[in-house]
Amino acid sequence: MNLFTDIRTLVIDSLAAMTAEGALPEGLDFANVTVEPPRDAAHGDMATNAAMVLAKPAKMKPRDIAEALAAKLAQDKRITSAEVAGPGFLNLRLDLSVWQDVLGKALNAEEAYGRSDMGQGKRVNVEYVSANPTGPLHVGHTRGAVFGDALASLLDFAGYDVTREYYINDGGAQVDVLARSAYLRYLEAHGQSVEFPDGTYPGEYLKDVGAALKDKFGDRFVGQPEETWLEEVRNFATDMMMDLIREDLALLGVEMDVFYSEKSLYGTGRIEAALESLDAKGLIYEGVLEPPKGKKPDDWEPRIQTLFKSTEHGDDVDRPVKKSDGAWTYFAPDIAYHYDKVSRGFDMLIDIFGADHGGYVKRMKAAVSALSDGKVPLDVKLCQLVKLFKDGQEFKMSKRAGTFVTLRDVVDAVGADVTRFMLLTRKNDQGFDFDLDKALEQSKDNPVFYVQYANARIHSTLRKAREAGIACDEATLSGADLSLLTHDAQLAVARKVAEWPRQVEIAARTNEPHRIAFFLYELASDLHGLYHLGKSEESLRFVNESSELATHANLALARAVSIVISAGLGILGVKPAQEM
């Protein structure tokens, strides 16, 4: 269904024929031959680099290869012209029937149009959000949640078997801090005046936890030493925070398949098993690391520690996994967690971290490479910071959270759909200034409005056509005479529809769902342009009062656009608007 793949296959077959005829030497590798849209649409519909990449290994001039390939391609009825440009690029123009055929396939496939078998059912684990269970999700978590969820949906659309996973960081010191903070709110619920020391969590959201602790335990823990209440309060508060986090995720339409507890790794032999696996490969040793330059990391000490030879798998330095006092480092449970992922049989792992975890990437990749003997790739995506603006001012704090803007604040301000789309209009590793006022503007400068308005405009046109007695059911539109679509503006839209399967595969191959948002904006722009041309040219109007056949063809084109927009928005986790 990917037209660009079809034409690339034609190019490869033509090169193979040239080889058989002696026009090219034997043994050439065609893997780097591409077929893509040209940078300038005036140059044609597609362009191939075949002559440029084959010239050196073939020991031939690129133009000679390009001219011979052009003659071969011109024999195919789908190619109306093949022109050599510059040093040896080949620009192709396709017969109009090709674009019309693509529209027919889109109409018949409906929202399955663009789905790919690229993933071949390979199992992918996408871990995202994984926020500490110490409070509500903030705007940084929101970006990670949106990015991870859209990426998971994209990979599913591209034929992968995807598991969405959240790692609960409930095994470290931060949940002890949560417990102590919740205990203070518990005392407050009993009427005591409390002060929050530095390092505790002062947010008002813990008042609910304090009240719930009072309801469950009464005054049992009042005035008692920490060792009598820490574990129970910690477990209770962590569970309540995870309930809050699940509610926050639900506001964005994010549903996880797996919630994996860090705590489950301790005392179960899982950390030991992971390190034994590395030890069996000669990758664990006792030693003292050289002191690092600059700021010393938390896990460095000038004594003998248990170390992982991560440098043998691409890391800059070897990493401690057990301290000199026998305690695990932060890295040890992370190794065990990824060992568990590898053991579950995933073919590919994707971790989505905040930008502040950039220094963790190499060691994590080294661990997965070592644990899987290089068979399971790990891709780590970093999400840069988001700054919120409202009324021209940076929006910095939530009263309930105390120190940060929450996910709930953002969704309350602009809605889940707008939040999701807007956060996907920038690549994940770029900082993003999110203007809440502009996100609600009804203008071309607001991408989510512009795309949604295109879809709503199409549905409005179809409704009005039905009300006027014009048949525009799926069967009628699928059977429309698409050969009537010959205007440049119509063909520009058709070409964009044809590019959709290619965009899906590129976005999935690079793990970049923002490409989908960009593409939808471009498609919407072409649709709006065609609509406005119809105001002055009757033949381009979606409803052409002079020709029922032209009306059906135009409505079929519009319907194909709606199919792509709906599928694309579905990948982004945004509900397509049918009216605005």
Swiss-Prot record:
<keyword id="KW-0436">Ligase</keyword>
<comment type="subunit">
    <text>Monomer.</text>
</comment>
<dbReference type="InterPro" id="IPR001412">
    <property type="entry name" value="aa-tRNA-synth_I_CS"/>
</dbReference>
<dbReference type="InterPro" id="IPR005148">
    <property type="entry name" value="Arg-tRNA-synth_N"/>
</dbReference>
<dbReference type="InterPro" id="IPR036695">
    <property type="entry name" value="Arg-tRNA-synth_N_sf"/>
</dbReference>
<keyword id="KW-0067">ATP-binding</keyword>
<dbReference type="GO" id="GO:0004814">
    <property type="term" value="F:arginine-tRNA ligase activity"/>
</dbReference>
<dbReference type="InterPro" id="IPR009080">
    <property type="entry name" value="tRNAsynth_Ia_anticodon-bd"/>
</dbReference>
<dbReference type="GO" id="GO:0005737">
    <property type="term" value="C:cytoplasm"/>
</dbReference>
<dbReference type="InterPro" id="IPR001278">
    <property type="entry name" value="Arg-tRNA-ligase"/>
</dbReference>
<dbReference type="Pfam" id="PF03485">
    <property type="entry name" value="Arg_tRNA_synt_N"/>
</dbReference>
<protein>
    <recommendedName>
        <fullName>Arginine--tRNA ligase</fullName>
        <ecNumber>6.1.1.19</ecNumber>
    </recommendedName>
</protein>
<keyword id="KW-0030">Aminoacyl-tRNA synthetase</keyword>
<dbReference type="Pfam" id="PF05746">
    <property type="entry name" value="DALR_1"/>
</dbReference>
<dbReference type="InterPro" id="IPR008909">
    <property type="entry name" value="DALR_anticod-bd"/>
</dbReference>
<dbReference type="InterPro" id="IPR014729">
    <property type="entry name" value="Rossmann-like_a/b/a_fold"/>
</dbReference>
<comment type="similarity">
    <text>Belongs to the class-I aminoacyl-tRNA synthetase family.</text>
</comment>
<keyword id="KW-0648">Protein biosynthesis</keyword>
<dbReference type="GO" id="GO:0005524">
    <property type="term" value="F:ATP binding"/>
</dbReference>
<dbReference type="InterPro" id="IPR035684">
    <property type="entry name" value="ArgRS_core"/>
</dbReference>
<dbReference type="GO" id="GO:0006420">
    <property type="term" value="P:arginyl-tRNA aminoacylation"/>
</dbReference>
<dbReference type="Pfam" id="PF00750">
    <property type="entry name" value="tRNA-synt_1d"/>
</dbReference>
<keyword id="KW-0963">Cytoplasm</keyword>
<keyword id="KW-0547">Nucleotide-binding</keyword>
<feature type="short sequence motif" description="'HIGH' region">
    <location>
        <begin position="131"/>
        <end position="141"/>
    </location>
</feature>
